[in-house]
Amino acid sequence: MFTRTKLKFVASIFIIAIYLMVPVFAYDTEPSRASKQIMSYSMDVKSTGNGRIAIIFSVDGTGKMEHIGAERITVYQQVNGIWVYANSIDQNGSGMSANNTYYYGNTIYYNGISGEEYRVEVTIFAEDASGSDSRPKTFYEKA
């Protein structure tokens, strides 16, 4: 059978194997964020009926931002298979951005033609003393 020494050796190996099976999770000292200025963001485009399109965005800065919000929204309409410029609004337009705040979000509405296909390009941004950053996204929506 087993001698006392062999039994201790097998038990030690078994204990070491158990310790090796315990999961170890890495710890990151840096918080997860999109950039130095943008902590998180979201963008979406939805048809609300009767040709109206809701363009929804929000931006959460990593701190108090000098300027934060949507940098640009550009809308194209599909005409005979070709994307044709329909309208755009920049960061200085009504409801697009805010100054000296941590967060900004809003919904901008575009009045299109019911049943038509639209391409909407949305770019969010955040700007502070150390610089600025932006994130674009393109959506396709039937009004």
Please provide the spans of the model-predicted regions.
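Sec-dependent N-terminal signal peptides of Gram-positive bacterial secreted proteins and lipoproteins
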Residues: F2-A26
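Low-complexity, Ser/Thr/Pro-rich intrinsically disordered linker/stalk segments at domain junctions
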Residues: F25-A143
